[in-house]
């Protein structure tokens, strides 16, 4: 696969963002594309952002096999939600899994899986003066509450471990989550000051070699990480057709 930002042939060369721009490309790709992307091993990418119009949303929905009438009011609701979220720091360009979850939640296609009622993360120094992060999380499946604990290299890793290391206790979902791994974690500070907004991006993978990307935004880095992590779990469960929680 070509490097994303490589001139002429990179994936970014075939990304389309503005609403009118996307509408024109759908009618005639030659209006904005210098070459068929498939000729250089790439594909057309319709970006969903605060500049998006209905054309962007409909194109993205079709690409993930969501069939919905163009006149359905849920399309406008999704478009407004995307713009509101972009305003506070979200960016769905490169976070396809989080966008799909958002779209399916608004349309009503995502069931409830694991509810996380509360969580707590703390740091401490051990006898070797190494910082160790610990996390506790109360999970709920089918009305049963389960307290999970874990440690890790940093608060996000600890929270991830608290959930996944106790997956055997989640009999209903253990077989779906056992092979889930976080392979990349990125943090971006969107503004300055003590109330700076943080955007966290997580890349996940499974034993089938599938990769997906999720995002979380908050003034608290742990909360932003938590949102991205939960999206990763929900996406895996949805794609593997896991049963809903009762």
Which positions does each model-derived feature cover?
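A short, contiguous, amphipathic alpha-helix enriched in charged residues
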Residues: 3, 153-173, 177
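Short alpha-helix boundary/capping segments
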Residues: 49, 147-155, 213-224
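Glycine-rich phosphate/pyrophosphate-binding loops
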Residues: 64-65, 70-73, 168-182, 236-244
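Generic long, charged, amphipathic alpha-helical segments
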Residues: 170-206, 215
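A mid-to-C-terminal "edge-of-domain" accessory segment
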Residues: 4-147, 192-197
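Mixed-charge, glycine-accented linear interaction segment located at domain edges/termini
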Residues: 209-246
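Terminal-proximal interaction/regulatory segments of ATP-powered molecular machines
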Residues: 148-156, 162-163, 201-208, 226
């Amino acid at each position: 696969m070509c490097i994303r930002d490589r001139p002429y042939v990179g994936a970014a060369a075939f990304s389309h963002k503005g609403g009118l721009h996307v509408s024109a490309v759908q009618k005639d790709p030659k209006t904005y594309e210098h070459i068929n992307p498939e000729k250089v091993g790439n594909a057309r990418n319709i970006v969903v952002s605060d500049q998006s119009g209905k054309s962007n949303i409909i194109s993205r929905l079709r690409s993930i096999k969501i069939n919905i009438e163009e006149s359905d009011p849920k399309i406008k609701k999704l478009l407004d939600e995307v713009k509101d979220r972009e305003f506070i720091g979200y960016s769905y360009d490169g976070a396809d899994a989080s966008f799909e979850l958002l779209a399916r939640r608004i349309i009503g296609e995502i069931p409830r899986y694991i509810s996380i009622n509360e969580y707590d993360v703390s740091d401490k120094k051990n006898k070797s003066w190494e910082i160790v992060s610990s996390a506790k999380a109360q999970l709920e499946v089918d009305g049963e509450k389960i307290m999970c604990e874990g440690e890790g290299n940093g608060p996000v890793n600890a929270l991830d471990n608290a959930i996944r290391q106790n997956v055997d206790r989640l009999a209903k979902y253990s077989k779906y989550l056992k092979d889930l791994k976080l392979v990349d974690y990125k943090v971006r500070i969107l503004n300055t000051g003590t109330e700076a907004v943080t955007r966290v991006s997580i890349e996940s993978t499974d034993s089938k070699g599938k990769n997906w990307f999720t995002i979380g935004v908050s003034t608290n880095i742990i909360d932003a990480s938590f949102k991205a992590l939960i999206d990763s779990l929900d996406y895996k469960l949805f794609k593997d057709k896991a049963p809903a929680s009762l």
